[in-house]
């Protein structure tokens, strides 16, 4: 197989957060099928594109999403099995679909004879950084190390199942992964928690972000680590604490990734919850976790700077050389080592994103950075065509093309502006 090809069957997870999402994920890996994330906010056209691009064989979906599944199933010829998870919405099982709980209750005991391999695939669909969503495909052994807890607290790679078991026996953390599991920020922290023997907590309202619900869940379930996605998640939580001040005595760490958390918001959160650390975790679907930075009441709040870590590099504009500290201008933030093998069925984009420089293979998803004299990385955001809005990556050219389909639009330019809530928001100048 080439780097952009898969030899396994693919299972779509069209689900809100819940135990079924994580159960189905693990079950797919056990059966040597490849689960992949589906944005539950997609409209029919987007869903059809994604499912066909992924060559989906099985779709697991919540019953409240069944009408959309019914609308698009005939447009996805590879789809051969539907599994419906009951979320107490009204309606009957789709024709030919199987009920999730019934499958569990009637399953045979024991495990089938399956030969698992380190290069079995993990796949995560991008939110649009690459234009239309694409499936970044990894070897499971690489993803485990890159983002799912395959390293010790000292940063060394865990080499044996026994080491995982011994660590899990000591696991005690209680994680609330507030982002949707269909977002890497949500599913990665949940799987990392499970791999370390810790507990995954899920808030009551999983269809929208409710700051009070997040705070109350942290208090009730004694959460000590909360995952958020930048200001889009952090600000409603801060607002909830301002409206109704209350301590969260168990909370020690707020982990934020996928979008910028501004220094102003960090300062506010540290004033409201002075005992916590705010951990910036930078990375992408194409790199895993690349770097971390900690803010707390002792060191203050900063945003946008990270220490260069093992496997990180800054590449020149033409992607032919590694830049040294103190270089002129901006470079591309790159990651080597445990990185994806490519994008599903996209030879051209695989070649563009995964480059070899001086014999080392790098993933270069598009972040612009400057490596300062002291080896500090200063982030300058994605390239100008990509907009990060609340953790969702929006390709400006794709939005322009969609708007130009409207018969009254003569020309359009799409860009972004700063937003207190979303980090960036999409704006357009339209000529009619």
Model-derived regions, located:
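AMP-binding/adenylate-forming catalytic core of the ANL superfamily
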Residues: 42, 48, 59-61, 219, ...
